[in-house]
Regions:
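Acetyl-CoA-dependent GNAT
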Residues: 11-18, 22-77, 87, 100-101, ...
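Conserved active-site alpha-helix within GNAT-family acetyltransferase domains
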Residues: 97, 121-140
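Conserved G/P- and acidic residue-centered "switch" motifs that form tight phosphate/ATP-binding loops
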Residues: 94
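Conserved GNAT acetyl-CoA-binding A-motif
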Residues: 100, 107-119
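Conserved N-terminal entry element of GNAT/NAT acetyltransferase domains
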Residues: 1-15
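A short, internal acetyl-CoA/4′-phosphopantetheine-binding micro-motif in the GNAT/acyltransferase core
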Residues: 84-91
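Active-site/acyl-donor-binding loops of N-acyltransferases
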Residues: 140-147
Length: 148
């Protein structure tokens, strides 16, 4: 798979729905292209979020990151990484770091004072990645959800 120097980071576009869906499955969130198209379309239209992809000439899209800016009452605005995945065959070669840099640049321009990410307690490799890239572990919490 590709080396870091050959990885290009760019804004995602609707035509990226298929590889984004495949990569989402590697993250544990399987989706068909038909399911991904409206999700990606909505994300691309949102002014307070950005989606970037990592691609190589030989392998196409090998990763993506989705980040959003959150205006908060209790603290200064911050960005949150909503999702980040690199193709299993391309991990630990720098693409994730480049995607994170693109998201951080976008967040700064959006007026965010910091960035946070939530990661499943079982994803030790991801935790190491975020620590390596300057994040600090600051909270353990329980997550709740409700269908609407």
């Amino acid at each position: 798979m590709a080396r870091t120097s050959r990885v290009k980071i760019r804004r995602a576009k609707l035509a990226d729905a298929a590889p984004i869906a495949i990569l989402s499955g590697q993250l544990g969130y399987p989706a068909t292209v038909e399911e991904m198209v409206p999700r990606l379309e909505a994300a691309l239209k949102m002014k307070n979020s950005a989606c970037f992809v990592a691609e190589t000439r030989d392998h196409g899209v090998i990763g993506w990151i989705h980040v959003s800016a959150k205006p908060l009452l209790e603290v200064q605005p911050r960005a949150e990484v909503n999702g980040l995945v690199i193709d299993e065959r391309a991990r630990s070669r720098g693409a994730g770091g480049k995607l994170l840099e693109a998201a951080e640049d976008w967040a700064r321009k959006a007026g965010c004072a910091g960035m946070s990410v939530r990661s499943n307690v079982l994803r030790d490799r991801a935790h190491g990645f975020y620590l390596k890239h300057g994040f600090e572990h600051y909270k353990t919490q329980k997550a709740f959800r409700k269908k609407l």
